[in-house]
Amino acid sequence: MSKIIGIDLGTTNSCVAVMEGGEPKVIPNPEGNRTTPSVVAFKNEERQVGEVAKRQAITNPNTIMSVKRHMGTDYKVEVEGKDYTPQEISAIILQNLKASAEAYLGETVTKAVITVPAYFNDAERQATKDAGRIAGLEVERIINEPTAAALAYGLEKQDEEQKILVYDLGGGTFDVSILELADGTFEVISTAGDNRLGGDDFDQVIIDHLVAEFKKENNIDLSQDKMALQRLKDAAEKAKKDLSGVTQTQISLPFISAGAAGPLHLELTLTRAKFEELSAGLVERTLEPTRRALKDAGFAPSELDKVILVGGSTRIPAVQEAIKRETGKEPYKGVNPDEVVALGAAVQGGVLTGDVEGVLLLDVTPLSLGIETMGGVFTKLIERNTTIPTSKSQVFSTAADNQPAVDIHVLQGERPMSADNKTLGRFQLTDLPPAPRGIPQIEVTFDIDANGIVNVRAKDLGTSKEQAITIQSSSGLSDEEVERMVQEAEANADADQKRKEEVELRNEADQLVFQTDKVVKDLEGKVDAAEVAKATEAKEALQAAIEKNELEEIRAKKDALQEIVQQLTVKLYEQAQAAAGQAEGAQGAQDAGAKKDNVVDAEFEEVKEDK
């Protein structure tokens, strides 16, 4: 069975891993880094992903970051006259990770396990699955990030019974999950979180502070200057990381703006204490879901065996201190917070292929599911933290006499009124036979699969008429839309590959021109002048083709020049060999003569021993 790769599709960074020799291994990207920034840039119809895209974000307005925050919504971003959905942008990142995996494994990759925040709702999960399909991947399983982290952590500790809390603070989302590990079973007991809280928010409080300080000093609002804002974002992210290791850092941004007197510079020292003061509210926001998860699990903090930190933002000292204070446990530092989720996804891939045996993963649904009933009340059918996959049915009836149809309004959330919860979808069960209110028996069944994706069906028990819906939220893409995006993604991948080949061809041609100049110089006076002239002529023809940017002509002229240079190089090599041979012969004769001239006659003296 082909390999199933594990992908952590993050808000700020993404990571890909695979099972090798019974161990999950992170696959480095072409630059040799183990994580790839989740950044996509468009420049002259070329798409760039990762570090190269992030580096030019200051000067390129067509750079898209943190798109994961918009998954499952109808958000679109316009780039070069075309609208892109979050699924399409995510698919470009996934294609990049897929290519890294294929280069590493030396084989085509078609299957993946992709992780999502535990608190992602149905629409966000469906959008992630669609992104995988657009990227040319069969998404074998969607799993929750904290659960994946626990899988990677617990793979070697299956014989120990443990209660663990996974605290996952990423770039844009926050999750906390409580799990029990025993005999190879990883059972999620409860989960809670906040999909609008992460490292980006910690960057933002620094940006706001810098903007306020600069405005106070210069009366100029940098938040209105797009290029200045991107420089501030980069500086804030760097300062945040610096303050995990040092107690103060210098932020220096020369020529950030200009006033009447000339250019203005931003110079500021940010202390860890000030950063902790600015971000105290964000740290506190992580503790409420932590308490809720513990309460839902029915555990006291003292019952926990381990606290595992996941996500780059957990390197912030104030975050570590807060979770230590809340649980009374020193956080476990034995996992890499940037890589552990991808490693866990690879383990799940190994479970699905049969490479990893004796592991059973029992996950839960993060939010309650139900329908709207009379008076706008939200009636729950499946409570949050129910182990998935699961199915639940309940019988409802009509609210009016002779009602010909019922509207089924499917919702997800925890609030008592429908209006306060997230709408997943609506559908109708029609052609009900006339009957007084309360008589028709309508059975509504919810199914949640192992990916946490919802299917709902309604059945009139009197007529056996049935209507089903796989939830398509307002952002949900139809099969036709996904198929169109798949084709566009493939076409773009082909175009990107073609562009890469064109660049490589031009580079090779430039290199050959340089090499020809060197060979011609070395051969001056050593070979027939006509041969040198032939090489020079072919080189000039190639240079002319490069200037015209005619690819087929470049290819033909390059091949012709390559042959001439090869022949000249052989001659140069032969001459060097001949010269070396002559020099060796002359040296040998010289050594022989020297030996002859320097012969010393031995002198003997007879010594008579006294006896």
UniProtKB/Swiss-Prot annotation:
GO terms for molecular function: ATP binding; ATP hydrolysis activity; ATP-dependent protein folding chaperone; heat shock protein binding; protein folding chaperone; unfolded protein binding. Pfam families: HSP70 (PF00012). Induction: By stress conditions e.g. heat shock. Disulfide bonds: none annotated. The modification Phosphothreonine is found at T173. The keyword Cell cycle does not apply. The keyword Protein transport does not apply. InterPro entries: ATPase_NBD (IPR043129), Chaperone_DnaK (IPR012725), Heat_shock_70_CS (IPR018181), HSP70_C_sf (IPR029048), HSP70_peptide-bd_sf (IPR029047), Hsp_70_fam (IPR013126). It comes from Bacillus cereus (strain ATCC 14579 / DSM 31 / CCUG 7414 / JCM 2152 / NBRC 15305 / NCIMB 9373 / NCTC 2599 / NRRL B-3711). Residues 579-592 have a biased composition (Low complexity). This is Chaperone protein DnaK. Acts as a chaperone. Residues 579-598 are annotated as: Disordered. GO terms for biological process: chaperone cofactor-dependent protein refolding; protein refolding. Belongs to the heat shock protein 70 family. Keywords: ATP-binding, Chaperone, Nucleotide-binding, Phosphoprotein, Stress response.
